[in-house]
Structure formats: structure tokens, C-alpha cells
Amino acid sequence: MDYFCTDMTKIFTIGFSGKSSDTFLDVLNAARISCVWDIRLWRTSTYVPYYNGNNLAMILGNRYEYHTEFAPAPDILADYKDKKISWAEYEKLYRELLQKRDPLQNCNISKLDRICLLCTEKSALQCHRRLAAEYIAEQIPDIEIIHL
């Protein structure tokens, strides 16, 4: 399916690991984020309850959405965490999963500008949020990705 946006659309990514709740909100506000898309497989945090999906939904209100269509498959994530597959293999499997799911089919493309893909990892380098952002940019022309 072909998707189109007008002008240059910016999408952001953020990982909450190592960020206080105040810092997290300050970063989102400074970037003028329109909506946080939580793309974690499980939207709970044992270590930092502030980042549980229900808490984020209360704090962010209509600026929070849970998008399971961008979450990794449980088996792929488990195999990577258990070191059964390398990052390169994880990346390949996750990209194939996105192609199969076509996660943009149920998203309001006109509201993509200034969304922020949320996950746990501090760095986007080895996190599926980077891959999800790249997937969106491959599907839609004129997308700029910014990692917060």
C-alpha cells in the first residue's frame, strides 16, 4: 500500500531508560510531541512504574496511544534477549514482521507529524523503535527521523 504525507513530517523516538519522569516530560514538551506511540510488547515496567502504559495514559491523556502493531513478536524478542539470535538476525526478523503486518494500514497517516515512538532502551541503535521509525520512513516519502 502507498502512503503519503504533505511537507516534511518529523517522527521522533525515545527510550525511557535512565530518564526521570521530569526529564522525560521535558524532552517530549521541548520537541513539541503531538502523540506518544508506545510500541513495547508489554506496556509495563517492573523497575519504573511511572512508565506503565496506564500511568502514561493518565499523564499524557490523548497524547498517548498503544500501538501493538509495531511491537516485536514475543518469540523474536525472547530469542534476542536469550542471545539465541544476533542483533542482525533480530533486525531482519523484525523488518519481515513489519512487512507482513503492514502496521500503517490502521494508522491515521495525516497525524504522523511529531509522533514519538516509545520503548525502553536508552539508545535507539539496538532498539526496535529505530527499526519501526525506519520502516515508516521507507513507506512514506519525506519523513525525518529524530532520536531523542
Question: Positions of the model-derived regions?
Answer:
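Residues lining hydrophobic/aromatic ligand-binding pockets adjacent to catalytic sites
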Residues: 2-148
